[in-house]
Amino acid sequence: MEFKHISVLLEETIDSLNIKEDGVYVDCTLGGGGHSKEILKKLSHKGKLIGIDQDTSAIKAAKERLKDYENVIYVHNNFYNIDSILEELDIDKVDGIIMDLGVSSYQLDEASRGFSYMKDAPLDMRMNREENFSAYNVVNSYEEEELFRIFKNYGEEKFSRKIARFIVEKRTENPIETTGELVEIIRKAIPAKFQREGHPAKRTFQAIRIEVNKELQILNKAIEDSVNRLNKDGRLSIITFHSLEDRIVKVKFKELEKPCTCPPSFPICVCGKEPQIKIITKKPIEPSKEEKEINSRSRSAKLRVCRKI
């Protein structure tokens, strides 16, 4: 299956990076190479792009899309490791970093990946298929209380308790092996009148995907490490697709902009924590009405940008 992914907030993201033609840039979520190609168009032969992705299918697709460019380094890894990746490449500082945290259209559309609640497939949801831990393990081995926790915290699911109970009851008969089986369990757990608000499995699938790929833990550390690797005036641009991610980015940016932990009553700062960034986007940038109409998957996207000081 061809790797297809429509880059969200493409123009806004590229503009936010304030690209220098001889700069060094990192695309932490290479995907099909949409954002990367626009960055490369603005670079001279002295500039450089590092493209990171944990999905080998994405890297293969990006290499094909970017085959006309020689100043690209491809890295099969998780952007959680951005610090060690740059260390291994002997790159100290960079001028801009982008993270697009959405699941690609390819991953959603390829049924065998198990990300979609619209297609029956094995329970998988691994971004990196070289990892062993998958959605199957979460659904079939987590205790009821643990399932409740992730559905509530990562999916903000109103019926987390009931869904967790129904899953545990069902798997005592036989292991739950497919997305279709899981969707049916969720449908039975959620009252019919609440199933009119979008697909009933959406929040639960989001929660399981986040748990399988440790997405929220990765994001916090990656933001800190990325800021540390930016040159002065370098930009970090992050696109999120749900409120949990957006909240993490918003809070972390605020912590890095105003890190002082001194009590308000102190006349001067004595903690010694200096601001590291300036937030560029006081409110997140959202897709235009036109983009939302063209690409429905862009509707929940938000872009936040900061500048290293």
UniProtKB/Swiss-Prot annotation:
This is Ribosomal RNA small subunit methyltransferase H. Keywords: Cytoplasm, Methyltransferase, rRNA processing, S-adenosyl-L-methionine, Transferase. Specifically methylates the N4 position of cytidine in position 1402 (C1402) of 16S rRNA. It catalyses: cytidine(1402) in 16S rRNA + S-adenosyl-L-methionine = N(4)-methylcytidine(1402) in 16S rRNA + S-adenosyl-L-homocysteine + H(+). Its EC number is 2.1.1.199. Its main location: cytoplasm. NCBIfam families: 16S rRNA (cytosine(1402)-N(4))-methyltransferase RsmH. It holds the Pfam family Methyltransf_5. It is found in: Cytoplasm. Belongs to the methyltransferase superfamily. RsmH family. GO terms for molecular function: rRNA (cytosine-N4-)-methyltransferase activity. GO terms for biological process: rRNA base methylation. It is an enzyme of class 2 (transferase). S-adenosyl-L-methionine binds at residues 33-35, 53, 79, 100, 107. Gene3D superfamilies: Putative methyltransferase TM0872, insert domain (1.10.150.170), Vaccinia Virus protein VP39 (3.40.50.150). GO terms for cellular component: cytoplasm. It comes from Clostridium botulinum (strain Loch Maree / Type A3).
